[in-house]
Amino acid sequence: MIIDYFDNESINEDIKNYIQRRIKTYGDLCYSYLVMNKKTPLHPTIISNYPLDWVKKYKKNSYHLIDPVILTAKDKVAPFAWDDNSVINKKSTDSAVFKLAREYNIVNGYTFVLHDNSNNMATLNISNGSDDSISFDERIEINKEKIQMLLIITHEKMLGLYQSNSDKNENRNTQIERDIFSPRENEILYWASVGKTYAEISIILGIKRSTVKFHIGNVVRKLGVLNAKHAIRLGIELKLIKPI
């Protein structure tokens, strides 16, 4: 059975405690264990000791869809530093996710990556917390293999707990459809994706042009992008738009 959503609070709390007991071996570090299914990436699980406000804003705005660190991780199998060229090339100084990171001083770190056979990507993202950057970099470099193994064992443990929980509740399993867009937003984004103008969309749907712009604005905000053109492209690339 493929598990797309890791949203059991009890299991996630167990995993958080497991990580925290082991991560402290490497210093006073901030970490974020992020898991998402690459085919249905809209609802990642984030288990972290980062500030709760950061986690809430990151998830609410679906920043994992535009985060250069996560975008880089999709193409990686080895650990990498956040100042690696592969990350820098994806950075945008106007990116909402980096504005949020600077606000909480989450700017210097490393990411460890794992891709499993159920199409999930797991990352263990570590930043230096109260450690100075030089000693932090040295400590991570020395312990790279151990931290990568921590990610592997953690992810295997998490999959095992969810599989066990799924087996217990197999008869009660129901698929809950989770959409990032409202039905109206999806309609408008669909017509925009096939080349219709705001004026044409307003005629097709029998609504005002200003209403079309309002919903497009919501789509832009949800995806954390700069404009409608970028939102449409991202919606197409990630297959977020349902056909009408």
From Swiss-Prot:
Domain HTH luxR-type intervals: 174-239
Positions of the DNA-binding region: 198-217
Gene3D superfamilies in the record, alphabetically? Transcription factor LuxR-like, autoinducer-binding domain, Winged helix-like DNA-binding domain superfamily/Winged helix DNA-binding domain
> What keywords appear on the UniProt entry?
Activator, DNA-binding, Quorum sensing, Transcription, Transcription regulation
- Show the InterPro entries listed in the entry: Sig_transdc_resp-reg_C-effctor, TF_LuxR_autoind-bd_dom, TF_LuxR_autoind-bd_dom_sf, Tscrpt_reg_LuxR_C, WH-like_DNA-bd_sf
Any GO BP annotation: quorum sensing
- Entry's CDD domains? LuxR_C_like
Protein's UniProt keywords contain Cytoplasm:
no
- Similarity-based family: Belongs to the autoinducer-regulated transcriptional regulatory protein family.
The entry's function note states: Probable transcriptional activator. Binds to autoinducer molecules OHHL and HHL.
- The name under which this protein is listed is Transcriptional activator protein YenR
Please tell me the species this chain comes from.
Yersinia enterocolitica
